[in-house]
Amino acid sequence: MRAYHPTPATKTRALWREIGLPASRGTVLVDSIKMGFSVDVIDSIHLWASIPKAEILRATGIPSRSLTRRRTHDGRFTPEESERIARFVRVMDAAVDLFGGDKGKAITWMSTPIKGLGHRSPDSLLETETGALEVCDLIGRLEHGVFS
């Protein structure tokens, strides 16, 4: 019997790579969150998704004044704000996967009220971890054909 030797996953998901984040999970992401993401990540998400920056900030619960302050101070978000951004990207990435890589359909779906979410749009629930988990749970059910 051969011994199992795990190798670290090196493949970074396309969305995470496109917006300049080092990894979609693992200790590299944890370290990046602790250090604080660059404020430029909001611009990168905006360019990738064509979502207005104000909508990204609303969905992440980060006031626009905080973004302005961070830009003039040290150019980095706090770890808490970085965690919120990672949550947004994680859910957006799952939505893009749900739609077979079609980010246009995923973005439209994210802003559409969904019966399975109490007639709320997925992006309106991302400000809290519990809301994001509900969205990810729904995505998982849709991927596996479980509609209850």
UniProtKB/Swiss-Prot annotation:
Task: Look up keyword Coiled coil and say if it applies.
Answer: no
| Subunit organization | Homodimer. Forms a complex with cognate toxin Rse.
User: What keywords is this UniProt entry annotated with?
Assistant: Toxin-antitoxin system
Describe the function of this protein. Answer: Antitoxin component of a type II toxin-antitoxin (TA) system. Neutralizes the activity of cognate toxin Res.
Which lineage do the record's taxonomy fields give for this organism? Answer: Bacteria, Pseudomonadati, Pseudomonadota, Gammaproteobacteria, Enterobacterales
In Pfam terms, one family for this protein is Xre_MbcA_ParS_C
TM region positions: none
User: Which Gene Ontology MF annotations are present?
Assistant: DNA binding
Family matches, as InterPro entries = Antitox_Xre, Xre-like_HTH, Xre/MbcA/ParS-like_toxin-bd
**Keyword Aminoacyl-tRNA synthetase: yes or no?**
no
Q: Which organism is it from?
A: Yersinia enterocolitica serotype O:8 / biotype 1B (strain NCTC 13174 / 8081)
Family, according to the entry, reads as follows:
Belongs to the MbcA/ParS/Xre antitoxin family.
Under which name does UniProt file this protein?
Antitoxin Xre
